[in-house]
Amino acid sequence: MALAIYNSLSRTKEIFEPLHSGVVSIYVCGPTVYGHAHLGHAKSYISFDVVVRWFRQSGYKVKYIQNITDVGHLTDDADEGEDKIMKQARLEKTDPMEIAQFYTRSFYEDMDRLGVERPNIAPTATAHIPEQIALVETLLRKGYAYEVNGNVYFSVNSFAGYGKLSGRTDQEALQSGSRVGIRSEKRDASDFALWKKAEEGHIMKWQSPWSVGYPGWHLECSAMAMKYLGETIDIHGGGMENKFPHHECEIAQSEAATGKPYVRYWMHNNMVTVNGTKMGKSLKNFVNLKELLQTRNPLALRFFILQSHYRSPLDYSEAALDAAAQGLEKLHETLRRFRHQAAGSGSLDVTPYAERFSEAMNDDFNTPIAIAVLFDLSKAINSALDSKGIVEADRAAIEAFLTIAATNTLGIASNNLADEQSNGNSMQRLDKVMQIMLELRHNARKQKDFATSDKIRDMLLAAGIEIKDTKEGAVWSVKG
């Protein structure tokens, strides 16, 4: 069965055909690093991690780019408001780059624990200012952009294809209460910023032909995707909340600059809800990933996420996560039993299961069906082990399939489940110790015993554990 992908642009499943034979170029929007990752990040990056893994298992060479937004993402997600990283730096009374670097380390620490493989390249917006300026110059030269008072805007009316991804026209966007900023200096209210003149006191700023300023949020992804993957890329992924305005603006500025299709297949993962309600800080149901991983097995969380298709919403509850953890443990129990029991005389042909697994993954990366196949195989293995056992040749074939399916593709099991379980328990024990250390440090600071407070911090740092004081309290992370 050929691989079919649901293309958000055409709104249909399409047979995947790479631009270059045997090679897949993938760009996924990375996090804006102004806070710790949340459960929505986990769903998105685990989903695309499995996409990348399956392409590699299918024999493709994958070039995977995932950016880090460390400047330009304003609080209203468009042209107005304060830079999110600068706002956090102001709240924590520190430098914006320190904020970006700290939360970038925190993000990768969480992703590593969830088994999310690193991208080939993880470019940052601040390291690609020249490329972004060059893209703005091209758009100005071609007549798709205009400069006013040191700000440069993309003229939406100049690009006929604007709205083809989200299905939203300019008027529909405005009527629906879109947060695309409205400034009187724009030719049209829907025009979006490519370059912003820095206000007085704005720390993160660069010299440009138009002003000392900073790039618009949408600009960075186009500039970095095209630098590392070319003017047309195979797959662009991200959360469905980025479809408009972010991805719509990416298409407009990229295709206006090159005259070529920007992305061949758009993939969007759905959102996370909590007990049936959309997750959000304002609703006070925000699930902090780092806190969750301090009490939960990372593999169980990964398994929980993959039980839902990437295009389906994921409803989080403690009960649902408990059930997922129990289901994964049953699967692991079968794998441990299978690996420890000697060969027998009975047969178990894994071929039908392997075929069904491939069919599921080739059907728009249908991980729930793929997991169901593993449970069906688990039942068959237990039945065979209860009877005559499994001959060595069939055992080898089953082991090879499990390595491809459970380990290399889904990332929900390893070849050493005992070590896996031990690592999860170790992190839980470390968290309990850290809570005691943080409480001791908090009490010392409360009594103005700063010498003891600093000594605790320095001792932990020497052990590879970094402490950061935030307005919500102290948080810890493992360095490296």
UniProtKB/Swiss-Prot annotation:
Location relative to the cell: Cytoplasm
Cofactor: Zn(2+)
Motif mapping: 'HIGH' region: 31-41
Single Gene Ontology BP annotation: cysteinyl-tRNA aminoacylation
UniProt entry tagged with the keyword Cell wall biogenesis/degradation: no
The protein's Enzyme Commission number: 6.1.1.16
Family annotation (InterPro entries): Cys-tRNA-ligase, Cys-tRNA-synt_Ia_DALR, Cys-tRNA/MSH_ligase, Rossmann-like_a/b/a_fold, tRNA-synt_1_cat_dom, tRNAsynth_Ia_anticodon-bd
The protein's name in its UniProt record: Cysteine--tRNA ligase
Organism: Chlorobium chlorochromatii (strain CaD3)
